[in-house]
Amino acid sequence: MINIRKTHPLMKIVNNAFIDLPAPSNISSWWNFGSLLGICLILQILTGLFLAMHYTPDTTTAFSSVTHICRDVNYGWIIRYMHANGASMFFICLFMHVGRGLYYGSYTFLETWNIGVILLFATMATAFMGYVLPWGQMSFWGATVITNLLSAIPYIGTNLVEWIWGGFSVDKATLTRFFAFHFIFPFIIAALAMVHLLFLHETGSNNPTGIPSDTDKIPFHPYYTIKDILGAILLILTLMLLVLFTPDLLGDPDNYTPANPLNTPPHIKPEWYFLFAYAILRSIPNKLGGVLALILSILVLVIMPLLHTSKQRSMMFRPISQCMFWILVADLLTLTWIGGQPVEHPYIIIGQLASIMYFLIILVMMPVASIIENNLLKW
């Protein structure tokens, strides 16, 4: 009798994606982040669903409903903090996943890569809208500042901002629509993630060497299911350490003050995972220029396949490119630090230099390093 998992219409899909999938025999722990992102997404949808049962999207009651969840709902505090810190874990995994793709040349799978960039944008939009929902000071002012950036668009900017706000300022209409979008977006992300996987399974996974591995494949189960379970345990352990010991470590104290349109916080800043982009935005004195730089800082990922000048796919055997990559990582960490600092003397110039370096490394230094390596190998 043929195994049901190979014949049943639904089981067959699961089987071909997670059980009998031929996988390269040498993929490292950097390939764990895809499954970890899936776990993060499921965790966020589940905790978010339970939070939505008790949350009220109204300017007068939003803040107190979050307080109510933490104080009165059974295990509400742990659900709330798992959701808030789960977002941080989600972005840590996302950055690692994208970094892995850049290092090992995974961007040559064009469809998979481009859907991945769309997924990154969708996740960032979802996280931003979620940050507005508790209706604290940083929620309100973050929403005001970031949505206001659209007013830099020539001609239609002001109308566009008022259309998004649903009025002349961030108010009840804004909060309600952000809640609606924040609820629906994770399901769109889940659907896109399936398409992401669909295209990945058309080509098969890349591997650290960047060399085709068709001659040396192993079944996904049990080898990589076990490996993924180890990753999942470490992810959940890290998340629960955050949640149970330092739940507010990555949050902003200002968000424990209810939103007040008459009182601006001294330093308006987004969550830590947006600080690198926020630093790039702030480092340009022109509003439209800043907005364009902000969008391009993420959109530059789309042109990575065009910037690939090396004859090798992976950076595994390319020491100069490796140096460039790690300089880029250091630069992103610098930008993240600057994004959280006030706009004053040493920080402004450091932010501007780091922003220039960011685009310079990606657009000039990495392609040039690849050409130098080609010539050194006489290719």
Swiss-Prot record:
Keywords: Electron transport, Heme, Iron, Membrane, Metal-binding, Mitochondrion, Mitochondrion inner membrane, Respiratory chain, Transmembrane, Transmembrane helix, Transport, Ubiquinone. A ubiquinone binds at residue 201. The chain crosses the membrane at residues 33-53, 77-98, 113-133, 178-198, 226-246, 288-308, 320-340, 347-367. One of its GO terms (biological process) is mitochondrial electron transport, ubiquinol to cytochrome c. It is found in: Mitochondrion inner membrane. One of its GO terms (molecular function) is ubiquinol-cytochrome-c reductase activity. One of its GO terms (cellular component) is respiratory chain complex III. Its cofactor is heme b. InterPro entries: Cyt_b/b6_C, Cyt_b/b6_C_sf, Cyt_b/b6_N, Cytb/b6-like_sf, Cytochrome_b, Cytochrome_b_C_euk/bac, Cytochrome_b_N_euk/bac, Di-haem_cyt_TM. Heme b b566 binds at residues 97, 196. Binds 2 heme b groups non-covalently. Belongs to the cytochrome b family. The cytochrome bc1 complex contains 11 subunits: 3 respiratory subunits (MT-CYB, CYC1 and UQCRFS1), 2 core proteins (UQCRC1 and UQCRC2) and 6 low-molecular weight proteins (UQCRH/QCR6, UQCRB/QCR7, UQCRQ/QCR8, UQCR10/QCR9, UQCR11/QCR10 and a cleavage product of UQCRFS1). This cytochrome bc1 complex then forms a dimer. This is Cytochrome b. It comes from Ovis aries musimon.
